[in-house]
Amino acid sequence: MTESVLDYMSRLGRDARAASRLLARAATAQKNRALLAAADALDAARAELSLANEQDLAAGRANGLEPAMLDRLALTPARIDDMIEGLRQVATLPDPIGEIRDMRYVPSGIQIGKMRVPLGVVGIIYESRPNVTIDAASLCLKSGNATILRGGSEAIHSNQAIARCIQQGLAEAGLPAAAVQVVETTDRAAVGALISMPEYVDVIVPRGGKGLIERISREAKVPVIKHLDGICHVYIDVAADLDKAIRVADNAKTQRYAPCNTMETLLVHAGIAERVLPPLATIYREKGVELRGDAATRALLGADVLEATEEDWRTEYNAPILSIRIVDGLDAAIEHINTYGSQHTDAIITENFSDARRFLAEVDSASVMVNASTRFADGFEYGLGAEIGISTDKLHARGPVGLEGLTSEKYVVFGDGHVRT
């Protein structure tokens, strides 16, 4: 690359801005055609994708990447299937662009409503997880946004292989290549440039480690949609159904350890602890989960449960480690979650309707659940299509960010020669 990183990123930004204007007026059928063609291209390129991904995995192992990071990096056949299905599902979703709602007449006689429009250009910065390339590209494309994707250097070969499939889909639909651009340099200066171009980029969505997201939040000159941690809780209430409690608490922790919606702390009402914790502990031990608990938990489950420290309650492990606390009741559970949680996803297991309603109302998180695993906190599971990320902010989007989260609204006004007096 002969041009400087800043010049290169500025060129990507200019091209994305121009493409965003074309995308904003693209027909739904044209956008869907690009998505379906990209899905077909992925399906046909499975061998190429696997080969590129193996290059990244081999380099990651050689560089000592942690198991959780390698898990996120891997493009298994099932994950390739999920990417293809994600593209096809997004193609079936209703197109929000151009939708006009809340039309009403006001006393002056004019008619006012709101029209849904694209944000413009979305910058995505992410580590590992090459599937994010597809998730982000599909949602941005369907919502009429151009996107600039800056993946981690550890996934460079995987991302480039995926990008070729996306470009094929764009070409077949007659859409500009700059609608989806993957940053091809691994120079870290590209991140600084991308988050400092408000003239070209309308919003940044970072997905990665806490350090990366904190840096972007601190330095960005562009609005950021983000979450820092996934410290998710399951609270087993005294009125819980034992079978449901065991099934959900098992799945929330052990279905996968790396995702941000995995349970990291289990809270159990003291009145049900003796019945539910021993069978749960057996399941966790059989699956190799390290248990850490407060004094009451250790007294109940035995000395092999490590002492939980104050830091444990604030930690997103992304690993087979679980903190357990026995609490006096719902008030203590809510207080613990609102003190130590990350406002991501928290669940209560209970058959008591009033307890469930209190939990939903008082836990300050983006997703709050009753009798369901925290692992459901996902755009695909919510019917949004593939998500672009999860936001724990309260502006502009909150929770899994799908198509609607990538749009804004503008007022539209109809008159008949009306003038203000």
Curated annotation (Swiss-Prot):
One of its GO terms (biological process) is L-proline biosynthetic process. The keyword Amino-acid biosynthesis applies. It comes from the Bacteria. GO terms for cellular component: cytoplasm. It catalyses: L-glutamate 5-semialdehyde + phosphate + NADP(+) = L-glutamyl 5-phosphate + NADPH + H(+). Pfam families: Aldedh. It is an enzyme of class 1 (oxidoreductase). InterPro entries: Ald_DH/histidinol_DH, Ald_DH_C, Ald_DH_N, Aldehyde_DH_dom, G-glutamylP_reductase_CS, Glu-5-SA_DH, GPR_dom. Pathway: Amino-acid biosynthesis; L-proline biosynthesis; L-glutamate 5-semialdehyde from L-glutamate: step 2/2. One of its GO terms (molecular function) is glutamate-5-semialdehyde dehydrogenase activity. It is found in: Cytoplasm. Its EC number is 1.2.1.41. Keywords: Amino-acid biosynthesis, Cytoplasm, NADP, Oxidoreductase, Proline biosynthesis. Gene3D superfamilies: Aldehyde Dehydrogenase, Chain A, domain 1, Aldehyde Dehydrogenase, Chain A, domain 2. Catalyzes the NADPH-dependent reduction of L-glutamate 5-phosphate into L-glutamate 5-semialdehyde and phosphate. The product spontaneously undergoes cyclization to form 1-pyrroline-5-carboxylate. HAMAP family: ProA (MF_00412). PANTHER family: DELTA-1-PYRROLINE-5-CARBOXYLATE SYNTHASE, GLUTAMATE SEMIALDEHYDE DEHYDROGENASE. Belongs to the gamma-glutamyl phosphate reductase family. This is Gamma-glutamyl phosphate reductase. It comes from Pseudomonas aeruginosa (strain LESB58). The gene is proA.
